[in-house]
Regions:
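Accessory terminal helices/loops
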Residues: 115-120, 130-201
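Low-complexity, flexible helical/coil segments
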Residues: 22-29, 43-49, 96-99, 117-124, ...
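Short flexible/disordered coil segments
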Residues: 22-26, 46-54, 58, 123-124, ...
């Protein structure tokens, strides 16, 4: 999409340039009928934050850390008390927790958003209708609970194949079945794997 705006300032996290070089991204672009060579990273990359002056108002673009992906950014409109969260939040369905998500860090990124929210703030998600801080706190707890439950099951020696039926989940079976291999792999990378429990005689 950004190739169409080469002559305009485009903003995004600095990690996008490397992400666009991934074989999976090239394959997905080809499947959609796009030439992978035409993919463009933002020409105004940011690491943490950038303020943009629009004349009669300014907006802030902030990276609170990895979550839905490594490079999620949030757009804050202070004078309107609006925060555009992108896919860090989803209202119309459970959050998409794909292979490029960061389950452990995701709630921390949401904490950055929640620190800016008051009873009047309107939050605009990546998918669905705008929502308020009650929804924002609830979904933050749900995402955190997914990682926490998998971590608990692994500590109890529960293997991937048994996790869906053994755990207590906030989301539907299809959502959890899709994220479980990702969660187990991310925890395995931290050295957390199911180990058999010794029986006490």
């Amino acid at each position: 999409g950004l190739a169409a705006f080469d002559d305009l300032p485009t903003y995004g996290h600095e990690s996008l340039e490397a992400a666009l070089q991934a074989d999976q991204v090239a394959a997905e672009a080809a499947d959609l009928g796009f030439d992978p060579e035409e993919l463009r990273a933002p020409n105004r990359p940011l690491a943490l934050a950038r303020m943009i002056d629009l004349g009669d108002r300014h907006v802030e673009i902030v990276h609170f850390g990895p979550g839905h992906t490594a490079g999620d950014v949030v757009v804050i409109v202070p004078d309107a008390d609006v925060i555009v969260t992108g896919d860090l939040y989803e209202q119309s369905a459970p959050p998409a927790m794909g292979a490029d998500c960061h389950l452990k860090a995701w709630p921390v990124a949401l904490d950055g958003i929640l620190g800016l929210v008051n009873e009047r703030t309107l939050l605009v998600p990546g998918h669905g209708e705008p929502f308020d801080r009650v929804f924002a706190f609830t979904q933050r707890a749900e995402i955190s609970a997914v990682y926490g439950q998998v971590e608990y099951l692994i500590a109890q020696g529960v293997k991937l194949d048994d996790a869906l039926k053994t755990g207590e989940w906030q989301y539907d079976d299809d959502t959890i079945a899709a994220v479980l291999p990702i969660a187990f792999a991310q925890l395995a990378a931290e050295g957390k794997v199911p180990r058999p429990k010794l029986r006490l005689l």
